[in-house]
């Protein structure tokens, strides 16, 4: 299941660059927002502060897109479960629709997307698909449909399979950002699966699935850069740090947006030519990175930052209107 957006011509490998015409790309990202569409109160430097909120994140994204219209915006999953917004997860698909309103182009599944069981996830995806809104691509490359089909789909598995078809869930997509052809793929990690007791789906090994998907991209697409949305995470114990293992085992990945462990990486973790980046949780920070292609075709980091989403950032006026409308359905107002 592959979608190609704004591309012409497919061939070969990730390309080496002409040294006289090096390409650049800007990426902004969130993950583990857990239904925190609105700002929320917390203690910062021993003071009660209102932080986060999609309206402020939208302001920063819009400001960046004024400077760089081809900025890529992505999410790493666990966009649901954590505030009262989750009560309209099925009926309004508020979280994924609001990601679309931010300009987010792709996301992946986190373990909390399964909290309302197969029926709930299926209903949410159907609601989003039928809403008429622009919603992110949903990317997961390691669902083991073959094994489930051989065993005979359960009712829940069939519900999700049908909803995936309606929504258009894929292993990867190609997107065009200026002169840069971006391959985006998503993967669901081992610990994420262990944290999803209501998940009825079966998954293949994340590393092996990413290897296979990257090989397919390199064979069939004319990609300049490969970005993985991984709901796997990192750990201080490198032997258990899933996204570090992924970076080492699949060195053709250029960037891993690392979600699940709510890690806040002030600097990227670097293995070879692969950058692992994370921006904490609940939309407290908006991650951004600027990359420049090197002569060998790989990418160097020009800038990386996590911007705190605090009250000094003006709220985009249209965004609260959107999620207030969606939340009104909690009470039938």
What positions do the PLM features span?
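Sec-dependent signal peptide cleavage junction
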Residues: 7-19
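Short, intrinsically disordered, low-complexity terminal segments
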Residues: 13-14, 180, 330
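Acidic, metal/ion-coordinating pockets
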Residues: 17-311
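Short, surface-exposed beta-strand/loop "edge" segments at domain boundaries and coil↔beta transitions
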Residues: 312-317
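Acidic, proline/serine/threonine- and glycine-rich low-complexity intrinsically disordered segments
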Residues: 320-321
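Conserved small/polar residues in nucleotide/adenosyl-binding loops
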Residues: 324-331
